């Protein structure tokens, strides 16, 4: 039967789902030691759901790695542990202990150094420690300009570096999975999804997500044009700052001092989808790490970031 006739009756989300499942299976068949990066955000939750579907009724044939910067929202960590318990997947948590010993944090060292040491270096440490040859990530092309030119199979050097000029063509959904000794790939099954696709799929499949994505009254302080939630007592107020209880939610999740909330009353999934339909800003506008300097995401990716 002709391929087109097999796919013409699929909905937009079914096509995206089928593509992602195909990518998961391709990697599982081609690599000896894959891992899925589990950051606990909405994209990770969709990836987890797709991975469970791809290999059902067997569990996914790879562990899930969480790079813990020690500054994640507490609700994210609670959700991560609950999901691992409920779904029964193998969860690996890696913290850059050198960074902890040196006291690296977003307040003391700034977002640039904190992200490099506690995320990028920590990720490289974990990939080296477990000798993973392929790592799934939840990055999407619509998020940010350096990710827009990223391949689905992103080849990395033995030092985990990304050279955008040295990537392979991906015609007709045919992927070249060959790597030399020491090299690895980062794989992005959600490359062609948009933020709206993600939310519509979460709604359709009823995928559990961290409650921080839903609007609630939360203690926030306005700092550098962002609404930062006070998640623990490590965040000290600057002169003139006041804590306000505002109705907010998060479009994107990361380290709490670097993640801005948005004022919103979207309290359930259908509210969020409705809000996304009229949104005119990128979700990563709420990420301080992407504002460090022009082209900063590409710079981080070249150093080994996702």
UniProtKB/Swiss-Prot annotation:
Pathway: Sulfur metabolism; hydrogen sulfide biosynthesis; sulfite from sulfate: step 1/3. InterPro entries: PAPS_reduct_dom, Rossmann-like_a/b/a_fold, SO4_adenylTrfase_ssu, Sulfate_adenylyltrnsfr_sub2. GO terms for biological process: hydrogen sulfide biosynthetic process; sulfate assimilation. Its EC number is 2.7.7.4. It catalyses: sulfate + ATP + H(+) = adenosine 5'-phosphosulfate + diphosphate. It comes from the Bacteria. GO terms for molecular function: ATP binding; sulfate adenylyltransferase (ATP) activity. It holds the Pfam family PAPS_reduct. Keywords: ATP-binding, Nucleotide-binding, Nucleotidyltransferase, Transferase. It is an enzyme of class 2 (transferase). With CysN forms the ATP sulfurylase (ATPS) that catalyzes the adenylation of sulfate producing adenosine 5'-phosphosulfate (APS) and diphosphate, the first enzymatic step in sulfur assimilation pathway. APS synthesis involves the formation of a high-energy phosphoric-sulfuric acid anhydride bond driven by GTP hydrolysis by CysN coupled to ATP hydrolysis by CysD. Belongs to the PAPS reductase family. CysD subfamily. Heterodimer composed of CysD, the smaller subunit, and CysN. NCBIfam families: CysD, PRK05253.1, PRK12563.1. This is Sulfate adenylyltransferase subunit 2. It comes from Brucella anthropi (strain ATCC 49188 / DSM 6882 / CCUG 24695 / JCM 21032 / LMG 3331 / NBRC 15819 / NCTC 12168 / Alc 37).
């Amino acid at each position: 039967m002709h391929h087109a006739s097999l796919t013409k009756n699929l909905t937009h989300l079914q096509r995206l789902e089928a593509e992602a499942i195909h990518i998961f299976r391709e990697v599982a068949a081609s690599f000896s030691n894959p891992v899925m990066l589990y950051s606990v955000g909405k994209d990770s939750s969709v990836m987890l759901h797709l991975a469970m579907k791809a290999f059902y009724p067997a569990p996914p044939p790879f562990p899930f790695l969480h790079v813990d910067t020690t500054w994640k929202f507490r609700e994210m960590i609670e959700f991560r542990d609950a999901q691992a318990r409920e779904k029964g997947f193998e969860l690996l948590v890696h913290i850059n202990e050198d960074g902890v010993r040196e006291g690296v944090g977003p307040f003391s060292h700034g977002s640039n150094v904190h992200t490099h040491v506690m995320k990028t270096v920590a990720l490289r440490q974990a990939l080296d420690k477990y000798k993973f040859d392929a790592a799934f990530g939840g990055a999407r092309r619509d998020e940010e300009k350096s990710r827009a030119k990223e391949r689905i199979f992103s080849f990395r050097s033995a030092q985990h570096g990304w050279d955008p000029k040295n990537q392979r063509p991906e015609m007709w959904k045919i992927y070249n999975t060959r790597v030399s000794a020491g090299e690895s790939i980062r794989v992005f099954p959600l490359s062609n999804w948009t933020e709206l696709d993600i939310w519509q799929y979460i709604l359709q499949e009823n995928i559990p997500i961290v409650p921080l994505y839903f609007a609630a009254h939360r203690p926030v302080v306005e700092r550098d044009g962002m609404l930062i939630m006070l998640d623990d007592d490590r965040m000290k107020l600057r002169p003139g700052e006041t804590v306000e209880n505002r109705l907010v939610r998060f479009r994107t999740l990361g380290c709490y001092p670097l993640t801005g909330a948005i004022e919103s009353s979207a309290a359930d999934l259908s509210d969020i989808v409705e809000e996304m339909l009229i949104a005119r800003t990128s979700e990563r506008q709420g990420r301080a790490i992407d504002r460090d300097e022009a082209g900063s995401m590409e710079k981080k990716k070249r150093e080994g970031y996702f």
